[in-house]
Amino acid sequence: MVKPTRGLYTIGTIAALGVLAACGTSSTTTSSNGATGIAGCKGTITVATDLPLTGGDATDGPFPQLAAQLAVNQAISAKLMGGCTLKYISKDDSTVLKNGHDPAQGAANITALASDSTVMGVVGPFNSSVALAEIPVASTNHLALISPSNTNPCLTAVVAVCSDPTININTASLYPGAHTYFRVIASDVQQGEIDANIAAKVLNATKVYLIDDQEAYGRGLALLFKKYYTADGGTIVGQTSLPGSTTTFSTQISLAKSEGAQAIFFGGTTGNGCGLVRRDMGSAGFNVPLLGGDGCQDTKFISDANSGAKTTEAEGSYATSAPDVTKLASSAQFFSQYAAAYSSKAAPYNDGTKEPCTAYGYDAMNILLKAIQATLTANGGQPLASPQAFRDAVVAQLRTTSYDGALGHTTFDANGDTTNTGFTLYKVTSGSWVGVHTYAVDTSGNVTVKS
């Protein structure tokens, strides 16, 4: 294998020659490119997404999926793979049974994609619980995964919460083969500390009640919040772990109220009840702040919270999520191109700014595409004869990523984690999530305001 070099990729390189019309969310896009860019490349190269597109997650997954497909369409238009045919497949890891993301479906999707020898990488999954099921399959099959949104730290590194009996994640066992997993978003080690700092110093809450949804992401985030919040002198007055199928939280709200909680922290997703907690807080007349992580920051939270007697209950709710890249100069071109490509889509999918991870899906796919292109270039402009060797070479290129895109500058550390970190605090204001400040944790472990 030729030793990969560190290339500097820019958003303009991939966006050249405009945008093609998008296809549906559960679809395949194919185009045969002319013999330019990589002279004489022959064969088919496939990339894919695996994201939750239906059910309770329908307000989340379609955004990074559409963004990733936009990146593929631009690559096809720019003939990024030269004479090779670039093909795109979209997979939905939601099921009717789960009314949203389903780890078993995710694993089945990756198994199916891995069985196709032309598939060189996948953008996804969206949820950490799905990642736990997918990573071992991808590892065994040498297939690159790049998540736009997974934040559970145990997916890539061993931290204290991994051994908690309710989480019990053996990080090493996730990789029976090659380490092929990467993510373009920071982990909950940072998010938990930032959330704790916000609860104590922005919301001025000295007592907090915790609720989590029993999943890898939500439970892990709640435990990290607890660790940092109590270390700062805060008191956890109660903690409840409930399954994602829970539809009423009145008992927990009553407990929090009776214990004098000055805020509630929810570790989990909107699909697993985050907005319903806010709804039930309103019904109980419990008017303290609700704070959640990135799993709560979507339009479904607002509609769920406002579905009770008080139709403005979502107002004033807080959540930390992916940095508000709409304020970055580096993202302006992407959001303009997204709007042009999907102007005919029904709201809210016609506006990429409505979901924080939209741009993350775009950069993740562009990073994958550039890694494949670099692999072809290093092999004389042709796919490697062995599909496994081709996949291994793509993963090797991903490890050397140095990419300037919508998110700014992205590189990966030895664990596959992005070095471009931070989380934005959002607040529901006049019916929409509005970014307040972006925070990061410095090398000394202190929470700082980035913007």
Residue ranges with predicted function:
Residues 19-22:
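C-terminal motif of bacterial Sec signal peptides marking the signal peptidase cleavage site
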Residues 4, 29-36, 59-64, 78-169, ...:
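Beta-alpha junction/loop-to-helix N-cap segments that form part of ligand/metal-binding clefts
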